Structures are given as structure tokens and as C-alpha cells.
């Protein structure tokens, strides 16, 4: 394996959505492969046909590609090591399983579900770790089952599985890139089923066969697979193969340090896409769930290119990583604040066009969908929104008439003379040839000064009638962006709808 091109893989089961933990596993495999100028491969592990969900494979790959994780080889792309779907590789597993049978590293087992459960319950009652009791281990392999009985069962054609025979009294040791040396006693390892009664291999068997045949150099996966390693290493030993290097990632935890689960929040990548999170923020956030650049670095916002450059498995911790949604929200805001305006326009425009399909506007559609107009809205609102879609939804008054006015703000800001002041000031605004923020501000101050009023007497009512709300960006810049025609129309409508009430 020395000098071999680095090859990593993400091998999901098509059983539903892409979990954020799965996204992290895929990301770390991708980052490591790209940093090492190697290849990242997607393999679909669908050996458990009972859990297979129609369309899940396509959705998994679509979610990965949304995140910017594009495979060099996959079921869709193909490659030199296919097929990349395990259910299309069944003949391979059968041949290798027969080799283990011939070499007496595996045996037929005809135990029924009832027998297995009875044995399990008995061992639990005795305080023992549940394991198969080897009733069907043949005499020639150190068991008690006569070969004639096994042959008779095979001739009868009844259901059976094929189990690996775990050697007695051996220690299984390996070096984990993240955790260091790890050791298991073979006494704790069950005689794992390799081939099920339906002719499909188990995860453990198919995974080892494929990882070897596809020439993966590194296996990077979640901590939950750590206990499977001794079974996998024994299979490598049985076949005389060199195992790949391994790294087991820390668990993802809720804020209370319980294992991340749907009961305490969203765990599907699709949920975060639906809520409007950007792929940049999600990838940045997920990358830091277990990894950090190290002492001396204060950087928290990374592009994919920077992550590839700086990532290393040696900087991944062993302790569980807490999924902090506040951190994700903070990152989302950082990306919005720092992303060039010209990159945000093509993201926001489709959101606006979708809204225009649902709602009518009194503003010129050509104007409000133009790049120049959207750029002005972005510059005014980028410090105030948390998601890209909020440039349209949270800032809807830049595109649609207010359908209501903030009642509390009206109670607080409306005086007996507010409507008459608005009427007078409307006449001044109508005469402005240059409808700019500076010009509007100057004329407003000139208007209120002789009356002994503060600018706030008009600023707040103007904001309410123009936007429907009591908060937002600079009023004068907001009015400039809206334009004279829209502002005059909204002031008139506001005066008609809002009256002073003591």
C-alpha cells in the first residue's frame, strides 16, 4: 500500500435521508482524499433489502452534491472498480464466501430464529455476553456437529446462513489514526453471519470484500463501527490481504451530551436545506464537529478549498462533538455578511421569482428583479438577515406592499398631527428631482426644524407606512431604494389606513 494513490469512500445505505453524521463522514473522506491528491468514491450498501427506500440513493447523492462533495467514482459516474452498488455484486461475495468455507474459516448454520433467541436470553440470564453457541460448528473445525447432519440439511434445501469462525484465544490489534492502538480479545467476538438466508451478504462481509477489491487505502467512518473492526481484520487475515488504514470519528452529541437524535432537533441534511441554510455554512459547521486547525489559529470561517488545504485526521479529536445550532446560525450570518454581492444576486433572484408567482406586486417587476435593484437590497440588508431567503421574506417590503402595520409601533409612534405632517412632507417629497438618501434626510430636517419637532416625529411614521414594520435599515437609504413613486403611494395608503387613537 506504500506509494499507492489515496482512495477513500462514503458507503451509505439507501434507507432514507442523509444524516448530518453521514455528511460529516462523507466530508472528512472527501477532504482527506483531495488533500492527498487522491480519489473519493461513493458506494451504495444495499445488502439489507428490507430497509431499502425507493429514491433514497438518488437523494443521498443529490444532497452530497448540494454540499459540494462530488465523487470521482459512483453508481452514476461509474469507474474502473464497479459496480458501485452492492446488490449488483452478489456473485463476487458468493465466490469469496465459498473460499472461506473451503479454508474452514466459515461454516453453515441452520439455527432457527427461535433457537437463537432462546440461546440469547439464556446467556443474558447467566450474565454472559450474547454470542452464537456454535451448535452447528462442524466436527472438523473443532465443533460437535457431524458432517453427515450438515450434508443432510443442505440436501433438504432448507434455509441457512454462513458464519465466520472466530479463532479462539487470539488478540486482534490495530492502530487507529485518531484513537491510537486498539485491542480486542477474540473471546468477545461473535461468529458473525457472512451470508444471509436470502443469499445477500451482511454489511461486514460485503464491506471488507469491496474495500479490498476497490483498493481503498483509508477507511474513515463513525465511532459506532469501532466494535466491528476485529471481525473485519480477521476477514482480511483469512484472505491474506493487507487491511487499509482506519480512522473512527467521534460521536455527534446534543447540547446535553446525549447522542444526536431527531428527538432533540433536525438531523437530516434535507431539513437544513429546506430551512434555507447555505451549503457553505453547513460544510464549515460540519467540518468543525470533531476537527480543528490547532493551537494558534483563530480562523472559524473556511471555504471548501481552505478546508482541503488545512484538514488532517490527526487534528480530529476522540471526544464527542456537540452539535451547537447557535454556532451554525452564526456561521450562516458570517457567510451572508462576507459573500460578494454578485454571488448573492443569482441565489436570491429565484427565491424572489417564486414569491412573485404567489403574490402580486405594485412595483415594476423588471425593476425589482433587476441585478442593480437586488444589489441595493443586499447591501442594505446583509447585516440584518440570517438566511439567504430572508432577503426576500424578511425584507418583503422591498418587493411587495405592506399588508398590515405593526400595531404596537403605531400606538407608540402615531400622534394627533402625524397624518397631517405626512401629508405636508409628501408634497415636499413629490418635488424632489433627486430622490436620494442625502436629499430626503436634508429636506426632512428642514421640514421639522421650524415646527420645533425632532426628526423622529416623521422618521418612525415614514418607516411604518413604507415597510409596515418599526425596524430595518437606514430609513433614508430604504426610501431611496424603494423610489419616489412607491414611497408616495405607500404614504398615501398609510394615511388612509392609520388613524390616531389616544
UniProtKB/Swiss-Prot annotation:
Q: Does the keyword Hydrolase apply?
A: no
One GO BP annotation is:
glutamyl-tRNA aminoacylation
Provide the top EC class. ligase
Q: Which gene encodes it?
A: gltX
Q: What is this protein called?
A: Glutamate--tRNA ligase
Keyword Signal on entry: no
Motif 'KMSKS' region: where in chain: 259-263
Oligomer status and interactors: Monomer.
Q: Where is this motif: 'HIGH' region?
A: 12-22
Amino acid at each position: 500500500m506504500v506509494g499507492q494513490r489515496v482512495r477513500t469512500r462514503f458507503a451509505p445505505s439507501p434507507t432514507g435521508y442523509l444524516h448530518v453524521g453521514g455528511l460529516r463522514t462523507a466530508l472528512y473522506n472527501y477532504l482527506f482524499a483531495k488533500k492527498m491528491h487522491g480519489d473519493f468514491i461513493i458506494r451504495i450498501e444495499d445488502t439489507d433489502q428490507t430497509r431499502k427506500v425507493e429514491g433514497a440513493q438518488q437523494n443521498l447523492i443529490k444532497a452530497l452534491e448540494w454540499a459540494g462533495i462530488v465523487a470521482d467514482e459512483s453508481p452514476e459516474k461509474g469507474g474502473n472498480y464497479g459496480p458501485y452498488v452492492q446488490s449488483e455484486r452478489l456473485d463476487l461475495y458468493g465466490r469469496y464466501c465459498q473460499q472461506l468455507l473451503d479454508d474452514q474459516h466459515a461454516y453453515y448454520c441452520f439455527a432457527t430464529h427461535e433457537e437463537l433467541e432462546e440461546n440469547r436470553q439464556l446467556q443474558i440470564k447467566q450474565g454472559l455476553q450474547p454470542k452464537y453457541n456454535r451448535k452447528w460448528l462442524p466436527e472438523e473445525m473443532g465443533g460437535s456437529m457431524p458432517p453427515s447432519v450438515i450434508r443432510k440439511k443442505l440436501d433438504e434445501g432448507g434455509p441457512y446462513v454462513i458464519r465466520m469462525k472466530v479463532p479462539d484465544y487470539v488478540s486482534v490489534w490495530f492502530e487507529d489514526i485518531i484513537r491510537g492502538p486498539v485491542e480486542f480479545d477474540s473471546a468477545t467476538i461473535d461468529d458473525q453471519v457472512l451470508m444471509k438466508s436470502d443469499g445477500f451478504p451482511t454489511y461486514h462481509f460485503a464491506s471488507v470484500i469491496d474495500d479490498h477489491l476497490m483498493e481503498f487505502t483509508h477507511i474513515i467512518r463513525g465511532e459506532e463501527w469501532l466494535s466491528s473492526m476485529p471481525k473485519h481484520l480477521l476477514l482480511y487475515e483469512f484472505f491474506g490481504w493487507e487491511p487499509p488504514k482506519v480512522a473512527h470519528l467521534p460521536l455527534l452529541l446534543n447540547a446535553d451530551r446525549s447522542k444526536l437524535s431527531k428527538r432533540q432537533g433536525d438531523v437530516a441534511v434535507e431539513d437544513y436545506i429546506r430551512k434555507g441554510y447555505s451549503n457553505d455554512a453547513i460544510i464549515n459547521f460540519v467540518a468543525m464537529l470533531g476537527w480543528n486547525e490547532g493551537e494558534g489559529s483563530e480562523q472559524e470561517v473556511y471555504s471548501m478549498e481552505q478546508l482541503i488545504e488545512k484538514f488532517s485526521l490527526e487534528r480530529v479529536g476522540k471526544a464527542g462533538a456537540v452539535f451547537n445550532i447557535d454556532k451554525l446560525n452564526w456561521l450562516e450570518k458570517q457567510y451572508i455578511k462576507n459573500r460578494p454581492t454578485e454571488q448573492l444576486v443569482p441565489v436570491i433572484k429565484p427565491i424572489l421569482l417564486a414569491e412573485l408567482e404567489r403574490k402580486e406586486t405594485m412595483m415594476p417587476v423588471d425593476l425589482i428583479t433587476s441585478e442593480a435593484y437586488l444589489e441595493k437590497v443586499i447591501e442594505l440588508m446583509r447585516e440584518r438577515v440570517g438566511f439567504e431567503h430572508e432577503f426576500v421574506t424578511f425584507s418583503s417590503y422591498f418587493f411587495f406592499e405592506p399588508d398590515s402595520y405593526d400595531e404596537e409601533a403605531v400606538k407608540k409612534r402615531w400622534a394627533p398631527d402625524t397624518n397631517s405632517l405626512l401629508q405636508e412632507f409628501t408634497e415636499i417629497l413629490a418635488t424632489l428631482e433627486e430622490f436620494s438618501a442625502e436629499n430626503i434626510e436634508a429636506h426632512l430636517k428642514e421640514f421639522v426644524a421650524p415646527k420645533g419637532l425632532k426628526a423622529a416625529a416623521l422618521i418612525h411614521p415614514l418607516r411604518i407606512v413604507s415597510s409596515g414594520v418599526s425596524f430595518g435599515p437606514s430609513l433614508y437609504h430604504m426610501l431611496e431604494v424603494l423610489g419616489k413613486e412607491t414611497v408616495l403611494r405607500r404614504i398615501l395608503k398609510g394615511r388612509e389606513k392609520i388613524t390616531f387613537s389616544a
